[in-house]
Amino acid sequence: MNKIKFADYNEGQDIPELRVGPIKQMDLVRYAGASGDFNPIHNDVEFAKSAGLPGTIAHGMYIMALMGRQVTNWAPPTQVKFFGVKFKGMSLPGETMVFTGKIKKKKEENGDKLLMVSLTAANDKGEVKVSGDLTVKAE
């Protein structure tokens, strides 16, 4: 993986997109096993409906993990200085998720060359499910 170089990027520039999906119920089962989160809203359709949901929903942390994959496909983990998200909506089985990012600011601070990136996870209809912020320490 190539290091991110400060001079190679400009404000407003996109980072590489990641598309994942459609999300399958089995993806949620696998994530539940890996994370230990067996809340039935993620794996029991009838329970989820009884809780007022349209059906099962993806774990928010699963969607965040996919966003993390987008980040580390682009930047080596050693260059990630900050990664945080806000959950905006529920992701459902059958949806294809599109992860995008845009460099919103370049700055030098205390000798560090930083790229500030805004991240978005939306379904293929454009409905935003997660937004995030990323800071990369560039070379």
Model segments located where?
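HotDog/MaoC-like acyl-thioester-processing domains
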Residues: 1-15, 90-139
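Catalytic strand-loop segment that frames the active site of acyl-thioester-processing enzymes
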Residues: 1-56
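Generic structural detector for well-ordered beta-strands
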Residues: 19-22, 86, 135-137
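Short, intrinsically disordered, mixed-charge
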Residues: 33-36, 72-76, 124
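Short, intrinsically disordered/low-complexity patches at protein termini
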Residues: 39-41, 80-82, 87-88, 117, ...
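Hydrophobic beta-strand-centered segment that forms part of the acyl-chain substrate-binding groove
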Residues: 49-58, 62-103
